[in-house]
């Protein structure tokens, strides 16, 4: 149980932040408004995924 939770948590956090953040920064000032919208969506999606993964593990 410990190994599965650690692996999934670390992998999702690193992949999601690295890919999405890099794309927004490359576009520059034009992407400022888009960044705010994407940030809100990211939090909601992550919470839903975490709840589902915890339920399956139990």
UniProtKB/Swiss-Prot annotation:
<keyword id="KW-0544">Nucleosome core</keyword>
<dbReference type="GO" id="GO:0030154">
    <property type="term" value="P:cell differentiation"/>
</dbReference>
<dbReference type="GO" id="GO:0005634">
    <property type="term" value="C:nucleus"/>
</dbReference>
<dbReference type="GO" id="GO:0000786">
    <property type="term" value="C:nucleosome"/>
</dbReference>
<comment type="function">
    <text>Protamines substitute for histones in the chromatin of sperm during the haploid phase of spermatogenesis. They compact sperm DNA into a highly condensed, stable and inactive complex.</text>
</comment>
<keyword id="KW-0238">DNA-binding</keyword>
<keyword id="KW-0221">Differentiation</keyword>
<keyword id="KW-0226">DNA condensation</keyword>
<protein>
    <recommendedName>
        <fullName>Sperm protamine P2</fullName>
    </recommendedName>
</protein>
<feature type="region of interest" description="Disordered">
    <location>
        <begin position="1"/>
        <end position="58"/>
    </location>
</feature>
<dbReference type="GO" id="GO:0030261">
    <property type="term" value="P:chromosome condensation"/>
</dbReference>
<keyword id="KW-0217">Developmental protein</keyword>
<dbReference type="GO" id="GO:0007283">
    <property type="term" value="P:spermatogenesis"/>
</dbReference>
<keyword id="KW-0539">Nucleus</keyword>
<keyword id="KW-0158">Chromosome</keyword>
<dbReference type="GO" id="GO:0003677">
    <property type="term" value="F:DNA binding"/>
</dbReference>
<keyword id="KW-0744">Spermatogenesis</keyword>
């Amino acid at each position: 149980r410990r190994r599965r939770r650690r692996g999934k948590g670390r992998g999702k956090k690193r992949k999601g932040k690295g890919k999405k953040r890099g794309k927004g920064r490359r576009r520059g000032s034009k992407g400022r408004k888009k960044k705010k919208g994407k940030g809100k969506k990211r939090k909601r999606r992550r919470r839903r995924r975490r709840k589902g993964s915890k339920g399956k593990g139990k």
